[in-house]
Amino acid sequence: MDSPCWLLLLLLGAFAIIGCVQAQDQQEFISLDCGLPMTEPSSYTESVTGLRFSSDAEFIQTGESGKIQASMENDYLKPYTRLRYFPEERRNCYSLSVDKNRKYLIRARFIYGNYDGRNSNPIFELHLGPNLWATIDLQKFVNGTMEEILHTPTSNSLNVCLVKTGTTTPLISALELRPLGNNSYLTDGSLNLFVRIYLNKTDGFLRYPDDIYDRRWHNYFMVDDWTQIFTTLEVTNDNNYEPPKKALAAAATPSNASAPLTISWPPDNPGDQYYLYSHFSEIQDLQTNDTREFDILWDGAVVEEGFIPPKLGVTTIHNLSPVTCKGENCIYQLIKTSRSTLPSLLNALEIYTVIQFPRSETNENDVVAVKNIEAAYKLSRIRWQGDPCVPQKYAWDGLNCSNNTDVSKPPRVLSLNLSSSGLTGIIAAAIQNLTHLEKLDLSNNTLTGVVPEFLAQMKSLVIINLSGNNLSGPLPQGLRREGLELLVQGNPRLCLSGSCTEKNSKKKFPVVIVASVASVAIIVAVLVIIFVLSKKKSSTVGALQPPLSMPMVHDNSPEPSIETKKRRFTYSEVIKMTNNFQRVVGEGGFGVVCHGTINGSEQVAVKVLSQSSSQGYKHFKAEVDLLLRVHHTNLVSLVGYCDERDHLALIYEFLPKGDLRQHLSGKSGGSFINWGNRLRIALEAALGLEYLHSGCTPPIVHRDIKTTNILLDEQLKAKLADFGLSRSFPIGGETHISTVVAGTPGYLDPEYYQTTRLGEKSDVYSFGIVLLEIITNQPVIDQSRSKSHISQWVGFELTRGDITKIMDPNLNGDYESRSVWRVLELAMSCANPSSVNRPNMSQVANELKECLVSENLRENMNMDSQNSLKVSMSFDTELFPRAR
């Protein structure tokens, strides 16, 4: 009686495994439901294909959401019922992160569906980077159209653009990217899909999961001319192209055994060049004396002679160079040889046309530099989409580029004009990466800090306009060179012609005298204050003494010594909110952290300065000053403070789940955190750190990044804490400052330790160690290991290529290995001994975002158990060759 139950369990297990495999297979897919509002769930699983679609909102700045008419919705799958339309700009571009030099299948779908009620089907252009890909004519293809291309990007960013060419409004329904194996479809250029068919008269349309690359296969069969054969045995499809097994399980042979199998079609354009990929498998059980051998011909010429299909395997035959059609029709034939006893056979066929993309994209380094400048100044320019320089009529505002007569040569940025753009902060360091820049105009903004030395090193510059800002300090000597026009008027604090040195030398003697007198006065004042305080304390009997206090030598006036708009609490209020410091939730060199409540409901953490803390007031002051000027969802927020003579306390939001370390270790009742949540926590901590480095002026280095300083709220949202060691950079463009070494052993940047030169990359190193802790759940330093430091131990284990020895065993293998490898590589890159080889926090955050998206897809696919439905869908663009 138990057999049916066991059978059911086995079936469920099998389905779970299949679902898991499918989820992993589409980890690197990009499937965008264009126009899906962010107010709805931002991703979902399409029930027919099992593909995971997400909103396109984060990949494009422009456009509005639309939906096809309700009466048409049942005719299309869910991802194609919405659309994004573009009523404003002439060119609107998606920007997608891809792997440079990796081949992709790129597919775009367009369905008008009378979304606007105007019955006005649009015509517009589709561009890939700066080149025309296709003209989209929805007046001709009223039910929708699709464009599909095989393309190898030459940079890590891919722009897909919709360009308005008339009075109608461009739109897009879905955008899909599928990475392919680099050993398939080896051609010099890109390939535009003409048709992809498998020869079967009964089965229908195939795509993912039958095809692991999500290629679309239409069944095609000429009933009057062909005979179908099929097999129920499994066909091996393990060549570089991996056509679907279902497509190989059937084949067509000529009904007349002596006749050729012929497929012909008229070319769209007389000069079209074709690549054909024919997939063959012998699926018939041949008798002892049976032979199947045939020649493959193109327009009457033999391209493959005496071919014998492999038994239940697959061979893909393709032309090595593009071919054209000689007459009105292109003719593809399979003719059996005189030795063959059986007719020719064909299982599946792909036909592509060569598409030329003659215009090169802008130099990749220039593109990265301009985007970094855009990020540094938080610019939001609608026209800054797609390629910055080409086509020239769509070039970004404020940029002038080299106008090469040779369009195959990448353009370079020659001029950058950001005048009157509301810029604040320092002159962005990314400008120096525009190595061909001739003209720079940053005039009429509110830039501060010094004029950076790197401008003097940019030898191609002939004009620099910095007028109308708040720059200060001396000009670099290199900017006084002949041939350079430098405009700096309207910067009253800027020192010209050595005036800074002269002014300082004139004031040197008076300053020394004043400083000496002031020093004596301060010493006398301090002695008097100490004497008064000691007399006051000796006369106080029975006064309540706090458990942790320290006499401070600072202003005893009623006004606080720390300027703040946050709430100032009295010491008696601190005692009340902590119930006389009853519940201690943490402690360190500064003192203790106590739990408290305000108004009986709002929970807070109260950091109280310890009497034994030698650097206490300095670090306390630093933390308060920093928390007053930073505001980010992934940084602990300040509630208030107490600065009442010798009583100092900092009150900030209470995070009830404690720190990350205790959850990884399982100590103090910390709950287990799965791999997906670990990735999310790492990303949130990275975003907080990125804000300190890039979102603050001047930038801030935390100096003590570690798992115990990453706190978690009720939903396990991560926030960085403990800013007592943090340092701000001088406003100027320096990347390092010299300082006394401080931090936690094991997390401390070895380069910073040796040179005392602190930089943002010092935090990156510490964050890399945190990532290794998140991955391994191992102590940072463990003398019992052969390699005591965690980075050395992981590096040693990586040489063996087995991540199971590195991963936290508590995860029980519940993770996607590719995302783990990416995070491991990222962690080791962050922990590189040399700071120049480490990424910045923006790069770290972006990489973690991609890893988290992959992991979320895996988890969501594992949870999906929706039944599949068969939905028929047709596009007017599907081209079917006719056979004879």
From Swiss-Prot:
Protein EC: 2.7.11.1
Signal sequence extent: 1-23
Positions that bind ATP: 585-593, 607
Residues the record lists as Phosphotyrosine modifications: 652, 752
Enzymatic class: transferase
Catalytic activity as recorded in UniProt: L-seryl-[protein] + ATP = O-phospho-L-seryl-[protein] + ADP + H(+); L-threonyl-[protein] + ATP = O-phospho-L-threonyl-[protein] + ADP + H(+)
Localisation: Membrane
One Gene Ontology molecular-function label: ATP binding
Parts of the chain on the Cytoplasmic side: 532-884
Glycosylation sites: 143, 182, 200, 256, 289, 400, 403, 417, 433, 444, 465, 470
Residue positions where Phosphothreonine is found in the record: 570, 739, 744
Quaternary structure, from the entry: Binds to the ammonium transporter AMT1-1.
Family assignment from sequence similarity: Belongs to the protein kinase superfamily. Ser/Thr protein kinase family.
UniProt protein name: Probable LRR receptor-like serine/threonine-protein kinase PAM74
Gene (name only): PAM74
